[in-house]
Amino acid sequence: MQQTSNSNRTMMSFRRFTTTKLQLSHWDFTIYDTYIKMTNIHHITTTSNDSCLPTCPPLAEILKDKIPGYAFYSSAWQCQTMWMRFLIFGDEDNCIKTQLMFIDRSAENINIRLQHASYQMAPAHSLVFYIFPIILLRLDGLYLRVLPDKHPGVMDASCSQTWSCLNTPMPVVRLQGGMLSWDDEDMPFMLGQKTKPFLSKAVKVHALADEVCKVNDVCMGDNYMKIHLDFHFALDKHLPVDICMSPTNNTVLSFKFNPFVKTPWEPTPAKVPIVYMGEPVLIPGSCSTIVEYCNRYYVAKGLRITAIIVSVETDDTEFETDVCEWASECTAKIMVSNKSLFPRTLAPGTHIANAHFLLAERHFFSRILSDKNLKKLSTCIKLPGGFWVNAAKLPKLCKTCLSERV
């Protein structure tokens, strides 16, 4: 009986969806069970004065025949750990490049923003876009993975440690003291005694809202705990340090390094800043280079989570990045472009992008079939960055209606 059940679930992952056809204004829509595919009906021309493609009707109008009275508000699907939004993006083969965007209200027109404003032409039916609901992960705290110390030493002095909430699943330790530095260390650190609670695989750092958390990472030696801090020892060695942490084995998402080490912490963030921390890189005007983001994240067993890295959406930044995938327990290779005509130095501490963590399952055929064959499957969608989503496991459109929430 179990074998039959597993077989049925597998068949659901690559069977064909039921579809509904619709044409509105400039766009032709094919509505599947879990997503919408849209193409341009007419020839489209953009100029340097255009920031968007021709306006797309709101979701409520697109879905009115398939789901009468459709209404969606992302705020109604928001909780402390998850958030449902609609994602819209263009196919990688589109001749006009556009930005990846989120949709939060079904009543608003959809304005697809251009990647760059310039004179471009697209024949009819040459542009393809996908719209579908996706569940985003929100961090309920700043969790760091405890790793072995790569530069072990002898602890001759320890900071002050005060424990509280010892009768709870998540006791709190407060560490107070000064910073230390060793010759082979890149950052100053605090040393604490390695007690039994610190045998856990992760710690929750109790960061304060709207303040920069200076804890960079946590590692363990034979009899000590080492907490690296984002300070300059020569300048800050006399500063007192006060940190609160909780050891825990129950984490949905934890990091090797603190991604908020250069930006203020905000409670339950829906995105994580990608801050370049490598050596300075000189990028010529209007040129690009690949840099490595050396942080890693770890996901609880059984969860299908991946991250996509999206460029910071402001006009005053000097750099922009291509959308890319950031897989769990891996570093990320990021294409960074200099937006100006003049050489610019990508310096450590530069906030270049944001990471969004998606609760999405990779299509099991993505490691077997070629991209050409995968595109023929109606249950297979390629995200910007190369992640093939199993569309059969996405939330059904009919289940995202506000009436279903109530």
Curated annotation (Swiss-Prot):
InterPro entries: Herpes_Orf11. Pfam families: Herpes_ORF11. It comes from the Viruses. This is Uncharacterized gene 11 protein.
